[in-house]
Amino acid sequence: MMRVRPVERRDLADILELAGKTGVGMTSLPQNEQHLAARIERALNTWQGSLAVGEQGYLFVLEDTEREKVVGVSAIEVAVGMNDPWYNFRVGTLVHASKTLNVYKSVPTLFLSNDHTGYSELCTLFLDPEYRKDKNGPFLSKVRFLFIAAFRQHFSRKLIAEMRGYTDEQGRSPFWENVGRHFFSIEFAKADYLSGTGQKAFIAELMPKHPLYVDFLAEEARAVIGQVHPHTAPARAVLETEGLQYQGYVDIFDGGPTLEANTDEVRAVRDSSQRKVVIDDIDIDPSGSAYLVANDRYQEFRSILINTHLSDEFLHLTPDNAAALGVVAGDVVRIISLFAPETKK
């Protein structure tokens, strides 16, 4: 059975193994044991309530319970940019006009921005390639919305998600080669790694404070502004079906898009509901629709994916499913359809 739960210290080895499979461009999951161990500790301290808002970050794992192995991760940062500045480029416009010469020209530009400071961030989504099937990807991504809905008071009015930008098969980023390299004089992978391990002072020290003219960039760089890595396209589609949208902000390293939405308007947050548990000694109807189900326990959060038909205010679970969630008959669980009705697969 596949189950999502909060990270534990014993998961470090599995997460380090996952980090070795991400490739270049995923800054929040570097293959660095010390950094990942600290990330786990920060998540544990977040659940224990011992951190300031700007330091809080939740980390969830997708566990194959039969193998007792972590095969995916996803995370939520509670409020970005409250300690270290949060940078991205805002894709904007400058107008150059002259009545004398009868010239009027709109010029696309990139402005260094901290506009998303204080927003909650969906991040660190990675699924072992072996498990990219059976709806595991949407499950691992969207389970965060159930957690946010259940514990709404912990999160900002806005949600953002930085999408991994385009790099080629050799890990080369056209955006970096035409923008970042001119200011940093280091390889994309090195800058990516430094940022991912929290060493971000160099960004403030070296990035330009004035707008960059997009037309001055090579075509290969212009073409990837706001575009995602091919492997990230499914993750982007998942978030867009929930209501997150690209609003003209891109990553300063690879030009990947930032998606955003009002937290309360995200479909899986807004439309999730609570139901009482009934336990039946029968299998869940495989012909039913896919639903995310989660218990309502903050520190012992558990979520699974089931197929069922909803007909009343109760949710029927098998004993195995109830055990995976840590619930008994009469407990309340939160539920949401995995797919929006109009995008059901």
Swiss-Prot record:
Please list the GO biological process terms of this entry. arginine catabolic process to glutamate; arginine catabolic process to succinate
EC number annotated for this UniProt entry:
2.3.1.109
Please give the coiled-coil regions recorded for this protein.
none
Q: Which GO terms describe its molecular function?
A: arginine N-succinyltransferase activity
Q: What InterPro entries does the annotation carry?
A: Acyl_CoA_acyltransferase, Arg_succinylTrfase_AstA/AruG, Arginine_N-succinylTrfase
Positions annotated as active site in the UniProt record: H229
As its record notes, the protein acts as a catalyst of: succinyl-CoA + L-arginine = N(2)-succinyl-L-arginine + CoA + H(+)
- EC class, as a word, reads transferase
Q: List the disulfide bonds.
A: none
Where succinyl-CoA binds, per the record, is at L125
Identify the keywords attached in UniProt to this record, alphabetized.
Acyltransferase, Arginine metabolism, Transferase
Q: Which SUPFAM superfamilies match?
A: Acyl-CoA N-acyltransferases (Nat)
> Pathway, per Swiss-Prot/TrEMBL?
Amino-acid degradation; L-arginine degradation via AST pathway; L-glutamate and succinate from L-arginine: step 1/5
Function description = Catalyzes the transfer of succinyl-CoA to arginine to produce N(2)-succinylarginine.
NCBIfam families, alphabetized? arg_catab_AOST, arg_catab_AstA, PRK10456.1
Family of this protein:
Belongs to the arginine N-succinyltransferase family.
In Swiss-Prot or TrEMBL terms, this protein is called Arginine N-succinyltransferase
Q: Which organism is it from?
A: Yersinia enterocolitica serotype O:8 / biotype 1B (strain NCTC 13174 / 8081)
Q: What is the lineage of its organism?
A: Bacteria, Pseudomonadati, Pseudomonadota, Gammaproteobacteria, Enterobacterales
* Gene behind this protein: astA
